[in-house]
């Protein structure tokens, strides 16, 4: 996990360095040349790393932060605020981040749905076994898992 944190911190620093140069970006606004569309390997790498960061953030935090309204509300507010910006770089970067965030959230929801289906089938299969073959502990653990998933 510490490797992921270090990599994420680097990616987040790249993102924040982009946002802190707002005065430079205002001048760039009219030219249309900003980090997400800028030529060069380093900017292409930034775009890929930025998209990967958002997806990885959601994936790694799916059991913790996604169930807490405070961080998600603030992240959505931040992205919404930047998407309303007159600075194209802020607007487009936050829109891209919002799209990646939503895509990642849909993936998490799909995984949860698949886990629910598998759990339900396992529970039904165990319940349909004969009284001598049925494992009460297994039924109980599957029922607890079912409650966790809902």
From Swiss-Prot:
The record's listing under Pfam families reads: STAG (PF08514)
Provide the transmembrane region boundaries.
none
Q: Which domain of life is it from?
A: Eukaryota
* Family membership noted in the UniProt record: Belongs to the SCC3 family.
Would you tell me the protein name for this molecule?
Putative STAG3-like protein 4
Q: Which organism is it from?
A: Homo sapiens (Human)
């Amino acid at each position: 996990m510490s490797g992921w944190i270090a990599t994420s911190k680097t990616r987040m620093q790249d993102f924040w360095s982009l946002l802190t140069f707002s005065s430079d970006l205002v001048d760039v606004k009219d030219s249309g040349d900003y980090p997400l569309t800028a030529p060069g390997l380093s900017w292409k790498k930034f775009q890929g790393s930025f998209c990967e960061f958002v997806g990885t953030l959601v994936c790694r935090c799916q059991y913790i932060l996604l169930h807490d309204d405070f961080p998600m509300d603030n992240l959505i507010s931040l992205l919404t605020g930047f998407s309303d910006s007159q600075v194209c770089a802020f607007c487009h970067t936050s829109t891209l981040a919002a799209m990646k965030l939503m895509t990642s959230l849909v993936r998490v929801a799909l995984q949860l749905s698949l886990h629910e289906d598998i759990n339900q089938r396992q529970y039904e299969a165990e319940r349909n076994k004969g009284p001598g073959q049925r494992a009460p502990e297994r039924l109980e653990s599957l029922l607890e898992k079912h409650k966790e998933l809902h």
